[in-house]
Design a protein with these regions (language model features):
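Cell-envelope and extracellular/periplasmic
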Residues: 1-193
Length: 193
């Protein structure tokens, strides 16, 4: 939690830490699994008068490490945080997700999936943003739209608005009536979601 306000250096530092341990311990590229920082309202611990840093940037940096470091994986904990408690009570969720990573990536157990979808690219068609993911072949298509404060889109003005989203195969489609020409989309871009 101490790095929540230094996301801009986190991916490089964490990558060096893992590679340093591997070099020091001379065990090769041993599996390295870690937990995403759980959502929390960092405004609670921010000094009065200071800007509240958005920990979504740290979660993004943590996700990048998984793609930089061979034989690593991140257990996503977006649904396991506590708004007013920096140490979430849902420890079993974290343990189970780490175990799934080990089962699939280290031991090659088939029929279980420990990896979460990872952003690949976006395509914009008219008023809709189509988001493609890696590791998303397990999704079920659904035509039902759902609105959520967790999905937001912005136009050229970079003002984000809540959006509707739906799934088609391994893609997430996102749009907002307030943004006729979207250029960006974001998901769970708050400290606590």
């Amino acid at each position: 939690e101490d790095n929540w306000n230094r996301a801009h250096t986190y991916a490089d530092m964490f990558t060096r830490l893992i590679n340093g341990w591997r070099a020091e311990w001379k065990q090769g590229d041993f599996p390295f699994y870690y937990c995403q920082i759980a959502p929390y309202d960092y405004g609670i611990i921010t000094e009065k008068g200071k800007e509240v840093i958005n920990s979504a940037y740290l979660r993004e940096a943590q996700a990048k490490v998984e793609h930089r470091v061979a034989n690593s994986g991140m257990a996503v904990l977006l649904d396991a945080g506590m708004e007013k408690g920096i140490h979430p009570a849902k420890k079993q969720v974290a343990g189970e997700r780490l175990a799934l990573l080990a089962l699939t990536k280290t031991y090659g157990v088939e029929g279980v999936n420990g990896e979460s979808p990872y952003y690949k690219s976006i395509e914009i068609k008219n008023d809709t943003v189509i988001v493609s993911f890696e590791r998303a072949n397990m999704w079920i298509s659904g035509k039902n739209c759902f609105e959520s404060k967790n999905f937001q889109v912005a136009g050229e003005d970079k003002v984000f608005y809540p959006a509707k989203a739906w799934i088609e195969r391994s893609k997430m489609l996102v749009k907002s009536d307030k943004v006729p020409h979207p250029v960006a989309v974001r998901y769970c871009f708050e400290n606590y979601v």
